[in-house]
Amino acid sequence: MAGRSGDRDEELLKAVRYIKILYQSNPYPKLEGTRKARRNRRRRWRARQRQIHQISERILSTCLGRLQEPVRLQLPLLEKLHINCSEDCGQGTEKGVGSPQISVESRAVLGSGTKE
């Protein structure tokens, strides 16, 4: 099993070469002809680009063995989020949600608010 990651790297490089060839096979349309003809060429070019992008995703997901859907990030409920601001908000008393608690010096970052 010593050479396994090298084999996988070779497969990935081969997949990237294939994807590069796909994108090179669809150059941007020429800027000649009537406005309608140019618009139609650009529309067809964008449709081909979308197809190439989808094919590229399928090639990479097959090569890397990744899932189609990204893993959903668990976010806290909006009702639980709040900004804790006492009478003197400029002293960096804001608290974040969760740990670690990070103090932010808002005056140092934002300045006094006047332009010189």
Swiss-Prot record:
Placement of sequence motif Nuclear export signal and binding to XPO1: 73-84
Posttranslational modification: Asymmetrically arginine dimethylated at one site by host PRMT6. Methylation impairs the RNA-binding activity and export of viral RNA from the nucleus to the cytoplasm.
Renumbered ranges of motif Nuclear localization signal and RNA-binding (RRE): 34-50
Domain of life: Viruses
GO CC field: host cell cytoplasm; host cell nucleolus
BP term (GO), one: mRNA transport
Keyword set includes Oxidoreductase: no
Principal subcellular localization: host cell
UniProt remark on domains: The RNA-binding motif binds to the RRE, a 240 bp stem-and-loop structure present in incompletely spliced viral pre-mRNAs. This region also contains the NLS which mediates nuclear localization via KPNB1 binding and, when the N-terminal sequence is present, nucleolar targeting. These overlapping functions prevent Rev bound to RRE from undesirable return to the nucleus. When Rev binds the RRE, the NLS becomes masked while the NES remains accessible. The leucine-rich NES mediates binding to human XPO1.
Assembly and binders: Homomultimer; when bound to the RRE. Multimeric assembly is essential for activity and may involve XPO1. Binds to human KPNB1, XPO1, TNPO1, RANBP5 and IPO7. Interacts with the viral Integrase. Interacts with human KHDRBS1. Interacts with human NAP1; this interaction decreases Rev multimerization and stimulates its activity. Interacts with human DEAD-box helicases DDX3 and DDX24; these interactions may serve for viral RNA export to the cytoplasm and packaging, respectively.
Function, as annotated: Escorts unspliced or incompletely spliced viral pre-mRNAs (late transcripts) out of the nucleus of infected cells. These pre-mRNAs carry a recognition sequence called Rev responsive element (RRE) located in the env gene, that is not present in fully spliced viral mRNAs (early transcripts). This function is essential since most viral proteins are translated from unspliced or partially spliced pre-mRNAs which cannot exit the nucleus by the pathway used by fully processed cellular mRNAs. Rev itself is translated from a fully spliced mRNA that readily exits the nucleus.
Family statement: Belongs to the HIV-1 REV protein family.
Protein name (record): Protein Rev
Lineage, opening ranks: Viruses, Riboviria, Pararnavirae, Artverviricota, Revtraviricetes
